[in-house]
Amino acid sequence: MESKALLLVALGVWLQSLTAFRGGVAAADGGRDFSDIESKFALRTPEDTAEDTCHLIPGLADSVSNCHFNHSSKTFVVIHGWTVTGMYESWVPKLVAALYKREPDSNVIVVDWLYRAQQHYPVSAGYTKLVGNDVARFINWLEEEFNYPLDNVHLLGYSLGAHAAGVAGSLTNKKVNRITGLDPAGPNFEYAEAPSRLSPDDADFVDVLHTFTRGSPGRSIGIQKPVGHVDIYPNGGTFQPGCNIGEAIRVIAEKGLGDVDQLVKCSHERSIHLFIDSLLNEENPSKAYRCNSKEAFEKGLCLSCRKNRCNNVGYEINKVRAKRSSKMYLKTRSQMPYKVFHYQVKIHFSGTENDKQNNQAFEISLYGTVAESENIPFTLPEVATNKTYSFLIYTEVDIGELLMMKLKWKNDSYFRWSDWWSSPSFVIEKIRVKAGETQKKVIFCAREKVSHLQKGKDAAVFVKCHDKSLKKSG
């Protein structure tokens, strides 16, 4: 009888440990039951960023020591999004590796909710509340069991994972330090109430990168409305350079939405790679600029850094908390490193005859102390006599201090009979330029006092000149 009793006890202990490794345990302290937690929490290592080799199990204190959790360092919690394959995307180990490279002593935990994430999208979207609840209970347990400060916790959620992070942040005993939303999902969340999605109340600071908001509200892959303290819209947030939308539309038209997962990855995942870029290239962070609209940004009207009007993108963002969310914009390259250099250009077109041209193509070339950037194309919707126009251009290289610039007015792509006997022209005396990254203002004067810019002819040349207005700040 005694041997049978011992056998039953041993069997009970074995079953309890088996249950623990399947997603949770009934904790002995305080009677807390974690057995219904389905999400898994893997503490990955710098040596093996791709595999879930060691799991932290809520309610099982030994799992924390066995995985060598660092109680004195910050913790990153990475939450993936919807998946068709049921497997981790290739960006997960890349982000883990970048986090460890920047913060070698930190803990990088990857949340596995793959089973729930591979259902039909509306089903997986609904599961974000349960996943968020799992993550919150896990974080609360770390704080209560080990007195781990939540000020050391930074949640990073991609797509649906961003909303799961928001739910988690709203349910923790104390606010976590930061949540970064990486292109939070749009469908089912654009019009959702704050408790069901990512919002500024979910952490001490919430920053969001919006990279694929193309389409009508509620139908775009990424959420369009601001949901953080600082919401950044690279390249307007609609679509990213290097991502071929024409090809995407063609494939969808021919094959339907079956391959949409592959097609949306480029712009949707750009949010992740922009954040990775900020971790790896800390010496040259990209800058974003606060603006009321992307249209105003395209005119170059928002390159001010006064009163927190500009900010770093990604990891080294300044934690600015305003009453209203700050919408910020920037341009990027098509590949890492993504940083570019923004310039506002203001030109006054004058002449003896009243003239007006629509949708005119130009090229501008900038020459500096370090490098040059030539033949940058831009289009002005309108060019008219005695009017001043402001527009944004950017370079992919740091050209240093500006010294000279050239402006060329391109011919129309179509033939006009009037071009046989005359060519439109304007007189330009000065061009004003403001550099976003350095906040310096430069005035360029026509090399021949005034320049006659003629359509389809040689470029007009302007050189750096001195002007009293250069001393003004802003």
UniProtKB/Swiss-Prot annotation:
Residues 243-266 are annotated as: Essential for determining substrate specificity. Residues 1-27 form the signal peptide. Its main location: membrane. The apolipoprotein APOC2 acts as a coactivator of LPL activity. Ca(2+) binding promotes protein stability and formation of the active homodimer. Interaction with GPIHBP1 protects LPL against inactivation by ANGPTL4. Ca(2+) binds at residues 194, 197, 199, 202. The keyword Secreted applies. Glycans are attached at residues 70, 386. Residues 430-434 are annotated as: Important for heparin binding. Gene3D superfamilies: alpha/beta hydrolase, PLAT/LH2 domain. InterPro entries: AB_hydrolase_fold, Lipase, Lipase_LIPH, Lipase_N, Lipo_Lipase, PLAT/LH2_dom, PLAT/LH2_dom_sf, TAG_lipase. Induction: Induced by insulin. Inhibited by isoproterenol. Disulfide bonds join 54-67, 243-266, 291-310, 302-305, 445-465. GO terms for cellular component: catalytic complex; cell surface; chylomicron; extracellular region; extracellular space; plasma membrane; very-low-density lipoprotein particle. Keywords: Calcium, Cell membrane, Chylomicron, Disulfide bond, Extracellular matrix, Glycoprotein, Heparin-binding, Hydrolase, Lipid degradation, Lipid metabolism, Membrane, Metal-binding, Nitration, Secreted, Signal, VLDL. One of its GO terms (molecular function) is apolipoprotein binding. Transmembrane segments: none annotated. It is an enzyme of class 3 (hydrolase). One of its GO terms (biological process) is positive regulation of macrophage derived foam cell differentiation. Its EC number is 3.1.1.34, 3.1.1.32. PROSITE patterns: LIPASE_SER, PLAT. Key enzyme in triglyceride metabolism. Catalyzes the hydrolysis of triglycerides from circulating chylomicrons and very low density lipoproteins (VLDL), and thereby plays an important role in lipid clearance from the blood stream, lipid utilization and storage. Although it has both phospholipase and triglyceride lipase activities it is primarily a triglyceride lipase with low but detectable phospholipase activity. Mediates margination of triglyceride-rich lipoprotein particles in capillaries. Belongs to the AB hydrolase superfamily. Lipase family. Homodimer. Interacts with GPIHBP1 with 1:1 stoichiometry. Interacts with APOC2; the interaction activates LPL activity in the presence of lipids. Interaction with heparan sulfate proteoglycans is required to protect LPL against loss of activity. Associates with lipoprotein particles in blood plasma. Interacts with LMF1 and SEL1L; interaction with SEL1L is required to prevent aggregation of newly synthesized LPL in the endoplasmic reticulum (ER), and for normal export of LPL from the ER to the extracellular space. This is Lipoprotein lipase.
